Amino acid sequence: KIIGIDLGTTNSXVAVMESN
């Protein structure tokens, strides 16, 4: 899993993205 900061949404926060 990749943990990053999502600044592209109005609800900015920490996003957890699945990487294949």
From Swiss-Prot:
Keyword ATP-binding set for record: yes
Pfam families per the UniProt record, alphabetical: HSP70
Keyword ATP-binding: yes
Entry GO MF terms: ATP binding; ATP-dependent protein folding chaperone
Keywords recorded for this protein, A-Z: ATP-binding, Chaperone, Nucleotide-binding, Phosphoprotein, Stress response
Induction of its expression: By stress conditions e.g. heat shock.
TM ranges: none
Gene3D superfamilies named in the record: 3.30.420.40
Protein task: Acts as a chaperone.
Miscellaneous comment as given in the Swiss-Prot or TrEMBL entry: On the 2D-gel the determined pI of this protein is: 5.7, its MW is: 46 kDa.
Recorded family membership: Belongs to the heat shock protein 70 family.
UniProt protein name: Chaperone protein dnaK
Annotated organism of origin: Naegleria fowleri (Brain eating amoeba)
